[in-house]
Amino acid sequence: IRDSYNLLQGKPELIEDSKTIDLEKDFVPTLINEKKSFWDEFNFGNIALTPLSFVYWSVSTFKNTFFKPKASNEGEVPVVVVGNVTVGGNGKTPLVSQIALDLKNLGFKPGIILRGYKGSFTGTKLVNDNTTAKEVGDEAIFHFNRGFNVVVDRDRARALSYLERNTDCNIVISDDGLQHTSLRRDFEIVVEDANRNFGNQLFLPAGPLRDNIWKTKKVDLFIY
């Protein structure tokens, strides 16, 4: 879409009586709104999926009740977790990158752990110059290109352990991971899209929630 947009903007001539279309402003938002509309309202589809949502809610509530994440012990690298209670891109990655940059400017040596969304690699991977986005996903490459040590692993606790053993990081930021109770943490940040809010406030798959809304009142910082 972006390439098409650039081509359109670079056209020297337009068909008579035609209207210039800005794909970024006119077309992309429409696609996003259509994708989200199902979770933004109540309809027959939502109602049909509520039994599955109840299962998801039960698992989430059970984990929040009986599996409390531990804080770092003395001598361990502190961990900051940035996540959200809804699915979708709500600005976690740019926020993580900015936090890491600010910490670096303050004299810290931040490292970043993440799942590696859409990457093909399975296991634990310390991103290096030869690592591709196809292996670890765009987000991991984005963080690495900004000068940070990055470890990709679906198991965030294992990623943290690997990062501690193989780098000189003295603080770690988890890009997503709020729901990973096995990952120790010392500071939790939840970021959500204020325009979208919490949609229809139903759990997956009937709605966008993957955690209880009250979780936003339990974390250290809620960015909304």
Predicted regions and their residues:
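Phosphate/Mg2+-binding loops and adjacent switch elements
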Residues: 119-224
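A residue-level signal for conserved active-site and pocket-lining positions in enzyme catalytic cores
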Residues: 55, 93, 143
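Conserved small/polar residues in nucleotide/adenosyl-binding loops
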Residues: 1-4
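Residues lining hydrophobic/aromatic ligand-binding pockets adjacent to catalytic sites
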Residues: 52, 111, 224
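A transmembrane-helix-recognition feature enriched in membrane-embedded lipid enzymes
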Residues: 31-78
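Short Gly/Ser/Thr- and charged-rich N-terminal loops/segments
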Residues: 9-12, 16
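Walker A (P-loop) phosphate-binding motif
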Residues: 65-126
